[in-house]
A protein has these predicted regions:
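A conserved acidic, glycine/proline-rich C-terminal tail/linker
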Residues: 175-204
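Conserved small/polar residues in nucleotide/adenosyl-binding loops
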Residues: 227-233
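Basic side chains
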Residues: 26, 234-235
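Short, charged beta-turn/beta-strand-edge "cap" motif at the junction between a beta-strand
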Residues: 201-205, 219-222
């Protein structure tokens, strides 16, 4: 699926057939340069299943289909959101947020694909998320998340990539607003508190080898993951 509208339909149909518990939703395609490059109008969102979310510091096995690793801001949203009326705005959004945390997302395809040529590629693969690792959460207080320095590094591979939360669809709070309004429009109701992952502040960082990746976001703290590489099966 190259066209995002068709991919959205496919994703929603597939998600409706999956009976696994959903822990939240992710924003994808939130980098404005990527939106312009691929001539898309806006990001999209996808469901995130409980089995794909791990505790801080856990290990993740990757393979050839893995695109890379991301660092993002995630929010815990109160169950009361589902009974709210009207659209979510930047003025009323704070009352639905209970916690905020740094998060690592390992991204890659389930299908045999390489690279990103359209949002349809990502969307038809459920947003191409493999695993999420949530760092220590903090009780939410209003503060400016729109200009926080971020960094993800792996000392073993001599990798270090700097970023900023202002690359995430204006800012992570705006990305959250986008997702919540899409969830509301699609009449999703988890009937519980849930997480929203707002998109990468460092782009998609290639994983050059195994080791510990540490993600740091100013004012929020750190999150880490131990990356293992699956050995190809011999025939």
């Amino acid at each position: 699926c190259k066209k995002i509208n068709e991919a959205q339909k496919l994703r929603k149909l597939c998600e409706s057939k999956i009976k696994l518990p959903v822990i939240g939703f992710k924003a994808a395609g939130t980098g404005i340069p990527l939106i312009k490059k691929l001539k898309e109008k806006e990001p999209f969102y996808a469901s995130v299943y409980s089995r794909n979310v791990l505790k801080n510091g856990k290990s993740v096995k990757i393979n050839k289909s893995t695109l890379g690793i991301e660092l993002e801001v995630c929010y815990k949203i109160k169950r009361s959101f589902f009974s709210s009326k009207g659209i979510i705005t930047m003025k009323n959004i704070s009352k639905y947020i209970s916690h905020i945390a740094p998060c690592i997302e390992v991204v890659g395809y389930r299908q045999r694909k390489k690279g990103i040529t359209s949002f349809g590629d990502l969307c038809s693969d459920f947003g191409a998320n493999i695993k999420f690792l949530i760092g220590p959460k903090k009780k939410y207080k209003k503060f400016n998340v729109g200009n926080l320095k971020t960094n993800i590094s792996n000392k073993k591979n001599n990798q270090s990539v700097n970023g900023n939360t202002n690359t995430v669809y204006i800012n992570p709070l705006n990305s959250l607003r986008f997702v919540l309004n899409k969830v509301k429009k699609d009449k999703k109701n988890l009937n519980k508190d849930f997480w929203v992952f707002t998109g990468s502040s460092v782009g998609v960082v290639p994983i050059k080898g195994k080791g510990i990746f540490i993600g740091k976001i100013d004012k929020l703290g750190s999150v880490l993951s131990l990356i293992h590489i699956s050995e190809p099966t011999r025939r």
